[in-house]
């Protein structure tokens, strides 16, 4: 149960994310783009959609491989943290639907996106950036120094990708770092302590 529970929570989070993405895509069609983004106005427009798709796929492969090889005993915890982050983001994108930035490049057409990506990412699921926050969560919760460096590099490079390709506003990227830190803090300070106390009492009762 301790291993299957977080995996089930992660699957439920992805389903919640899918429903939220479908909703904001429907609502976002009629919403205007935000014009007053100073950073986007200063950055060049560059088509990095290939890295948007394949770079995130490389991150997904890396997080699974790193978990299995360096954090095998903590896989339930890692799965639970990603479930918490994905669920938090799904809630945020429903609360803050926005029109996509002007000049956003289309990511449709890539084989990987058509098979998997279209169920995970949507044109109007903007606040906050999953391409930034999910690698950054790996940086925060994994323990090996070299693994954390790789995650941080993924986070920064994908953050640059979504900005240059006009797939996110700058606030989506900036907020991703702060919200991810908040999710980790909330779990550590508010969720984990009562869970540990409950689990200790449950184990005592079971052994009695």
Provide a role label for each language-model segment.
Residues 57-60, 83, 137-138, 152-155, ...:
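Residues within membrane-spanning alpha-helices of integral membrane proteins
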Residues 1-60, 105, 203-207:
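N-terminal transmembrane-helix/juxtamembrane module of multi-pass inner/ER membrane proteins
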Residues 139-143, 180-188:
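Hydrophobic transmembrane alpha-helices
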Residues 15-19, 86-92, 155-166:
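Aromatic-anchored segments of alpha-helical transmembrane domains
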């Amino acid at each position: 149960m301790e291993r299957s529970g977080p995996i089930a929570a992660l699957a439920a989070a992805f389903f919640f994310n899918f429903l939220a993405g479908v909703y904001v895509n429907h609502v976002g069609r009629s919403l205007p783009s935000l014009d007053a983004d100073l950073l986007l106005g200063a950055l060049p427009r560059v088509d990095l959609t290939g890295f948007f798709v394949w770079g995130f796929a490389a991150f997904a492969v890396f997080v699974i491989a790193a978990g299995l090889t360096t954090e095998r005993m903590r896989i339930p915890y890692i799965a639970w943290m990603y479930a918490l982050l994905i669920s938090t983001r799904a809630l945020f994108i429903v609360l803050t639907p926005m029109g996509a930035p002007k000049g956003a490049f289309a990511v449709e057409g890539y084989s990987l996106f058509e098979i998997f990506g279209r169920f995970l990412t949507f044109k109007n699921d903007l606040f906050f950036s999953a391409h930034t926050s999910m690698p950054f969560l790996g940086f925060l919760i994994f323990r090996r120094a070299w693994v954390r460096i790789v995650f941080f590099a993924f986070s920064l490079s994908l953050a640059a990708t979504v900005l240059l390709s006009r797939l996110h506003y700058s606030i989506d990227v900036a907020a991703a770092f702060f919200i991810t830190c908040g999710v980790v803090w909330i779990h550590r300070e508010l969720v984990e302590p009562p869970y540990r106390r409950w689990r200790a009492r449950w184990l005592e009762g079971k052994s009695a």
